[in-house]
Amino acid sequence: MADLNSLDVLIQALRRLPGVGVKSASRMAFHLLQHDRPGALALSRALQVAADQMRHCERCHTFTQADICATCLDPRRDASKLCVVETPADQSALERTGAYHGLYFVLMGKLSPLDGIGPKDIGLKGLFDRACDGTVQEVILATNFTAEGEATAHVISEGLKSRGLRLTRLARGVPVGSELEYVDLGTIAHALLDRR
Amino acid sequence: MADLNSLDVLIQALRRLPGVGVKSASRMAFHLLQHDRPGALALSRALQVAADQMRHCERCHTFTQADICATCLDPRRDASKLCVVETPADQSALERTGAYHGLYFVLMGKLSPLDGIGPKDIGLKGLFDRACDGTVQEVILATNFTAEGEATAHVISEGLKSRGLRLTRLARGVPVGSELEYVDLGTIAHALLDRR
């Protein structure tokens, strides 16, 4: 068998990636060493730089290398709309639609009482301060449609409802391209309720 | 959206891993930055060290940090048996069985004429020299049971058959734990032929 030490260390390190077990990690390690050493070094540098330089935007909490992220600084953005998402990945999905031109607030988590994650841990105070800065007129709740995401949206709407803001939630409904026959009943029920 | 630059560079670098597309790469990057920065730095170091230090054993061509790997140097190994495998991952699978105590020769590839990979590219000359060193008495062909693996085994057996060595191939047969009803016919036919 190939020597232990640095190969094993690499396999163990790759296993820390989400969704990567020991088999995938071995395959990745062997691939990089056998076919793509420049790729291994590029990944090494990229990890180092990102872990060193990435921090949170002071306004929206997303990842950025500057104090304030490019989205928050963009003057073409509609500052009267604030879209609340759980993670930068969710924000990125919304951005890729090209259908939203307001600003964001990234919670970097969600309420999850079972895991001991309460309102303080996801910085709801910061969100409430931001939403009540006088510029924001509409808060769009775009947390996920999971139990935790719904609970998070509920707590935020409770916290903001007396502040004179317009509070909206992403529409629940039938996914584009799908056939009713195969859509789950809860989704169809919501699509009926929210028909327009 | 989160700033480009070092986050995007990281996502692109992660995409060079086998089996990782842009969605998985984003998830990995966000996970490391959000929840496991020590993991990101550990992976960065492990990649750097492995890419710098890993080279091929002079005797068996597997990955090692020394000139000659620990397996080749182990005096308890039976040097009269030489098992030919395609990759260190295959070698590792054989080692984990605990059923083999001979030495290895790792081709680091397989014949693949369609990809322009011929006998010279996978170092068959080195294998032939090694097999005819006077110590080796049996060569066990453990290349994969794919078209390329079978072709590789065939070429090796042709090259070695006049040298007075015992040439064997891993048995083809019904996998342990499986039911005949669900095993493919080619495998059952081989299991019949190779019955003992």
From Swiss-Prot, chains A, B:
Matching Pfam families: RecR_C, RecR_HhH, RecR_ZnF, Toprim_4
Keyword Repeat: no
Chain ranges of zinc fingers (C4-type): 57-72
GO biological process: DNA recombination; DNA repair
Domain Toprim: 80-175
Keyword field: DNA damage, DNA recombination, DNA repair, Metal-binding, Zinc, Zinc-finger
GO molecular function per UniProt: DNA binding; zinc ion binding
Record-stated family: Belongs to the RecR family.
Function, as annotated: May play a role in DNA repair. It seems to be involved in an RecBC-independent recombinational process of DNA repair. It may act with RecF and RecO.
Protein name per UniProt: Recombination protein RecR
Chain's gene name: recR
